[in-house]
């Protein structure tokens, strides 16, 4: 068995490539089922965000598992395998586990220490459980990664003052426009990113904001969180009119197709002299061809790196402290993973002990007689189980805790030989 992650991120692929592989939440269950149908894939979890798509696997064969996951990505994106390989990264076992911990802690994010990734990993874990992709191994890994992510944020200052994708977009808009208070600003979408956009715009003393959304009811829920602000709500069908009266538009919906297209722009009769579109969605909400219009400037998540770099230098120092904590967490994982090697031997030892206990108990009961048994059977059962458990407890604890691979391996072989455990198969022992 091996733990593998196959994926791509903002570090390995541009947004136009990432969006082709993005898996929306509504498709995660289907994707997990497809992956689990491959013969060498035992467990699956899928992490899909605007900056990464990562498939975490437990496989019975490392090479075949990688091949199957890569083939799945090619089939689901209509990309060729050579195209994919240019941008994919593959990590095995300890490297895969450490990568998940770094991702969850915000150390691998475009913005070091950003908080949203922790909730995204939690959702990945929940969906993996819901659609039965996560088994005992990935369950332990994700629980430990989430715990590590929380610990890093609690014990270091990595998330103090960290910017988010939304706040970085607002900062970039301010750099380009200088004074946002005089701009007509529209937000397309009413989800979490839109809420953060409103929050950061208000911190820049922006007074008037337009929210355009397919569901007006959902937009109202967003507006209700900012009662002090002057926020106007519009249906998506009114987007053309709103664009004609906007200087800046932020987009952050979960739409799988572009919403602002060249056709929509051509239908607008009277656009402002300069319209800036800040698209922080993946897949993108703004068709890349919209940038061909002279009076329109389009920015996407990859353009935020300019803003982020100003924030990163001080955060890298904090990241070093976080890395030390993650090394401790990885050591704890290695102890757990090593203990799995002992489980088959421990189970056989327990099974043999139980066979002996039951057989000897039956002999004792036949000698003691029915009257004694009816009055004391529970006590005798408890006594014999207690003796077996006490005898087995120390060797089992020592086997699980042994970190030295060679010592543990020798101990397992000695145990198997001394107790003749190779004869224990399917609960039967031919020698008894």
From Swiss-Prot:
CC annotations in GO: cyanelle
UniProt cross-references to Gene3D superfamilies, sorted A to Z: Glutamyl-tRNA reductase, N-terminal domain, NAD(P)-binding Rossmann-like Domain
UniProt entry tagged with the keyword NADP: yes
Catalytic activity: (S)-4-amino-5-oxopentanoate + tRNA(Glu) + NADP(+) = L-glutamyl-tRNA(Glu) + NADPH + H(+)
Enzyme class, broadest EC rank: oxidoreductase
Pfam families xref list: GlutR_dimer (PF00745), GlutR_N (PF05201), Shikimate_DH (PF01488)
Pathway: Porphyrin-containing compound metabolism; protoporphyrin-IX biosynthesis; 5-aminolevulinate from L-glutamyl-tRNA(Glu): step 1/2; Porphyrin-containing compound metabolism; chlorophyll biosynthesis
Cysteine pairs bridged by disulfides in the record: none
EC number: 1.2.1.70
GO molecular function terms listed in the Swiss-Prot or TrEMBL record: glutamyl-tRNA reductase activity; NADP binding
Superkingdom as given in the UniProt entry: Eukaryota
Record-level GO BP terms: chlorophyll biosynthetic process; protoporphyrinogen IX biosynthetic process
Keywords: Chlorophyll biosynthesis, Cyanelle, NADP, Oxidoreductase, Plastid, Porphyrin biosynthesis
Catalytic residues as annotated in Swiss-Prot or TrEMBL: 50 (nucleophile)
Keyword presence, Transmembrane helix: no
Compartments in which it is found: Plastid, Cyanelle
Residue positions binding NADP(+): 189-194
Binding annotation for substrate: 49-52, 109, 114-116, 120
Note: During catalysis, the active site Cys acts as a nucleophile attacking the alpha-carbonyl group of tRNA-bound glutamate with the formation of a thioester intermediate between enzyme and glutamate, and the concomitant release of tRNA(Glu). The thioester intermediate is finally reduced by direct hydride transfer from NADPH, to form the product GSA.
Comment block on domains: Possesses an unusual extended V-shaped dimeric structure with each monomer consisting of three distinct domains arranged along a curved 'spinal' alpha-helix. The N-terminal catalytic domain specifically recognizes the glutamate moiety of the substrate. The second domain is the NADPH-binding domain, and the third C-terminal domain is responsible for dimerization.
Function: Catalyzes the NADPH-dependent reduction of glutamyl-tRNA(Glu) to glutamate 1-semialdehyde (GSA).
Homology family: Belongs to the glutamyl-tRNA reductase family.
Protein name: Glutamyl-tRNA reductase
Organism: Cyanophora paradoxa
